[in-house]
């Protein structure tokens, strides 16, 4: 076992704080409409330019083990916020840094870290309640576009594209973002279906960089039971091979010998194939397989219908223009099912939604309806160079996630104003002075976003915060894009409540843990073995020692 280095108390916390500062300082320059870019060097290809906080955070690894611990904890804040809300990573990082800094000062001044943590938790719960009371539900396409525009750093076209996509496929519909072959960004809505089952073996992958399997003009075999061997399937497999087209198998499971045979055939190049598990369980799985069959114009191979695998012919297989399979999801695009059949199935599901009394069943039926009726919207991101396209794609991904979050929980005034206002409305009291200090730490941290946005815009942060808090109006704030003060919601500067709430809760959670850390353990760096004596130089003979 390698030797360890241990740091205690203040020494350890200061090292950790340095790591927090390094990561947060690199991330927070991207905050706000006038946030700057960060360039990330890549070991292959051109450097990447981004304004996406989590992309910056993920690239940071520090040499000093103790500093790196602090940096990685804050990176966790950004990643977790991104996973839950899909945006707000820079917000979470700025808040975490502010809480850790203030908390560290309080601990150094002799306050009890556990009481500080309790105070922080009390204040955060109070702020979340205040934000939820202030949140405004969004319903119109214009409001959706506003949220998208803000999250895409003021790019109005992105906001409009997202609003249009959501209008066409519904709030629950599937929207994907791809790189375009042209310089223009365009929106395309294609009928299709996505379900949460990925490929059964990574050997089916056709695009190793993105780890996805793309099949074009594909046959789809829908089987209700498990497939353990392929003997009974040989006639249909041979028929598919002769067409030269790929095959997707959707079954309860494909296991053992059957999966191994498919993988070997795929690797040898004899058969373009992929296999996924059927979505859902029990009766719901049967219904979803029927949905896929109707969408693709195929037949479910089911013993209930008296159809056996040996008797399957090509015309019983579904067809689709494209199937895209990732580790977690399968998307079937442009199935060749008859429009009248799809409309009939949609009407049937709508009738079931009306009749059901179970909330769970209703939710699942609505999911199926969205998959059948909504289709898939594809935003194709264009640009002059590959670097520009990747940067724009990052922003559109953020904007899409923020918009979905806004539809779920509503919106609050943007530009850090909602949190700054909440700092003046914390009414909860701590049980002692140290808890009260924890509450005040959150109070000060909540103003850090407005400060950072103003700093990035080249304005005097203290003056901006003072002016904003002087006026006792919930929506009054500072528009860094135009350097004007006014009603943030009227100016279209809004943030999704889910993003703001998640960022604050995650930042406070990790910051509290850092404040209450008393010992840190890391491996000692390995010492290099001393270099050996140089060998004698050939051809010169030995040297006489005098």
From Swiss-Prot:
Its EC number is 5.6.1.7. It is found in: Cytoplasm. ATP binds at residues 30-33, 51, 87-91, 415, 495. InterPro entries: Chaperonin_Cpn60_CS, Cpn60/GroEL, Cpn60/GroEL/TCP-1, GroEL-like_apical_dom_sf, GROEL-like_equatorial_sf, TCP-1-like_intermed_sf. PROSITE patterns: CHAPERONINS_CPN60. One of its GO terms (cellular component) is cytoplasm. It holds the Pfam family Cpn60_TCP1. Induction: By heat shock. Forms a cylinder of 14 subunits composed of two heptameric rings stacked back-to-back. Interacts with the co-chaperonin GroES. Together with its co-chaperonin GroES, plays an essential role in assisting protein folding. The GroEL-GroES system forms a nano-cage that allows encapsulation of the non-native substrate proteins and provides a physical environment optimized to promote and accelerate protein folding. Belongs to the chaperonin (HSP60) family. This is Chaperonin GroEL.
């Amino acid at each position: 076992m390698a030797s360890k280095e241990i740091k205690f108390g203040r020494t350890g916390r200061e090292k950790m704080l340095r790591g927090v500062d390094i990561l947060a300082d690199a991330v927070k320059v991207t905050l706000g409409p006038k946030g700057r870019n960060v360039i990330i060097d890549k070991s292959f290809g051109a450097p990447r330019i981004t304004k996406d906080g989590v992309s910056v955070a993920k690239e940071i690894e520090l040499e000093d083990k103790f500093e790196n611990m602090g940096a990685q904890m804050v990176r966790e804040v950004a990643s977790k916020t991104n996973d839950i809300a899909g945006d707000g990573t820079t917000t979470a990082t700025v808040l975490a840094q502010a809480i850790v800094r203030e908390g560290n000062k309080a601990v150094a001044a002799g306050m009890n870290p556990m009481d500080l943590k309790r105070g922080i938790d009390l204040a955060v719960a109070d702020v979340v309640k205040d934000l939820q009371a202030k949140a405004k539900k969004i319903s119109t396409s214009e409001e959706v576009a506003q949220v998208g525009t803000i999250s895409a750093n003021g790019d109005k076209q992105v906001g409009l594209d997202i609003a249009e996509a959501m209008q066409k496929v519904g709030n629950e519909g599937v929207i994907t973002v791809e790189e375009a072959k042209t310089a223009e960004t365009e929106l395309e809505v294609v009928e299709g279906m996505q379900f949460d089952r990925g490929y059964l073996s990574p050997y089916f992958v056709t695009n190793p960089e993105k780890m996805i399997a793309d099949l074009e003009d594909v046959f789809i075999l829908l089987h209700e039971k498990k497939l353990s061997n392929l003997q009974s399937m040989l006639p249909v497999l041979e028929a598919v091979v002769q067409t030269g087209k790929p095959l997707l198998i959707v079954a309860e499971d494909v296991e053992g010998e059957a999966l191994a045979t498919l993988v070997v055939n795929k690797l040898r190049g004899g058969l373009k194939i992929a296999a996924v598990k059927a979505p859902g369980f029990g009766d719901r799985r049967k219904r979803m397989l029927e949905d896929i069959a109707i969408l693709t114009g195929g037949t479910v191979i089911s013993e209930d219908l008296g159809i056996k695998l040996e008797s399957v012919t090509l015309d019983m297989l579904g067809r689709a223009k494209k199937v895209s399979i990732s580790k977690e999801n399968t998307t079937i695009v442009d199935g060749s099912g008859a429009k009248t059949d799809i409309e009939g199935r949609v009407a049937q599901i709508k009738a079931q939604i009306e009749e059901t009394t179970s909330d769970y069943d209703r939710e699942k039926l609505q999911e199926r309806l969205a998959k059948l009726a909504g289709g898939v919207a594809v935003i194709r991101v264009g640009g002059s160079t590959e670097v520009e396209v990747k940067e724009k794609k990052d922003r559109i991904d953020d904007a899409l996630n923020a918009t979905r979050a806004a539809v779920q929980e509503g919106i609050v005034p943007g530009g850090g104003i909602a949190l700054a206002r909440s700092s003046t409305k914390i009414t909860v009291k701590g049980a002692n002075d140290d808890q009260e200090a924890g509450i005040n730490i959150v109070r000060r941290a909540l103003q850090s976003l407005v400060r950072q946005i103003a700093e990035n815009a080249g304005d005097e942060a203290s003056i901006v915060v003072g002016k904003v808090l002087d006026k006792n109006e919930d929506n009054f704030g500072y528009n860094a894009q135009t350097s004007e003060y006014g009603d943030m919601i009227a100016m279209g500067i809004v943030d999704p409540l889910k993003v703001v709430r998640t960022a604050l809760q995650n930042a406070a959670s990790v910051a509290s843990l850092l404040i209450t850390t008393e010992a840190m353990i890391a491996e000692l760096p390995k010492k290099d073995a001393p270099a050996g004596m140089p060998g004698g130089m050939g051809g010169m003979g030995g040297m006489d020692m005098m």
